[in-house]
Amino acid sequence: MNDSPTAPTASKVIAFAPGRCDIQQAQQAQQAQQAHQAHQAHRAHRACRDEALPIAENICTVRSNDWINPEYKHLVLSAPATALTAVAGQFFHIACPPGADEAAYLRRPMSIYRVEPDDERIEFLYKVQGVGTRGLARLAPRDTLDALGPLGQGFRLPAVAPSERAHVLLLARGVGLATMAPLAQEAIRSGARVTAILSARSASLVMSADYLRESGADVLVVTDDEQTSDVVQIERMIRRVHAAQAITFATTCGSNRLLSTLQRLTAEFGIPGEIALEQHMGCAIGACYACVRPFRKHSGSDELTYRRVCWDGPVFDLQETTSW
């Protein structure tokens, strides 16, 4: 019998509509704060959300909060039903508890690592590196945690012909590995083949490899220590994978250099791709415009537009994303 704390959980739903999704083209980056007046939809299949969006403030209960390597912890929560609707690529805005002698003023955005509705469970991987995450690291079983969400636009797996088996490539580094895990699970459930290339500074910092293998993914690990993680070798690896079975969809998270490499290769292969972006946020519900970034107006365009990572993303079209 599982003696882990189960949910004295609750949620409060707030109706929120941040306004029309029509962004006027900004002329310069410093004008981004004016983008709340209007902005254009960035992709045809991402519909404008004018209606009120129910946003849940979920009171979750900690089941475990364990170190998995010298830098990262694995947080497992019992969560109410409103939190269990999260999909791959979405995130929660977490109210971090105070640390030993400091407290985080703002919530912290955190990508979903795993959602298990049957067990009323959500999970996160996070790097302990600042005021907020040091507070999170102090959480113990049966503590409660306020998590606003699920928030943002998640990944969307493209349809493939009935005669074709989808082949999804996941390319991630560092904490970006956590974002890729639920997408791998979703793709495998849909019948797709999944190849995951996991990059880290050292083998001890590679996360999710065993979990992805157990889920059915082909996992390739590259590290700085072994001098296998440079973009030249990663590109060769992707080309070999594509030659063995054509990749039909590619995703990445966690590295600017991986973004540039994957943009070039997906354009060459003629396949779609998406990226999950990491960004500092204020409100995480589209109201404060603290997370606005420049994007290409469309694939191949030199014209820029500005979008809110929290509301229009954090998942975006790969070819429309600019380097940072």
Model-derived regions: residue spans:
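FNR/FR-type flavoprotein reductase catalytic core
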Residues: 131-282
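Short, surface-exposed amphipathic charged segments that create phosphate/polyanion-binding patches used
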Residues: 233-239, 287-292, 324
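Long, intrinsically disordered low-complexity tandem-repeat segments
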Residues: 26-44
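N-terminal acidic, proline/glycine-rich, low-complexity intrinsically disordered segments
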Residues: 1-16, 21
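Ferredoxin-reductase
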Residues: 48-143
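Local cysteine-cluster metal-coordination motifs and their immediate loop/turn environment
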Residues: 18-24, 279-314
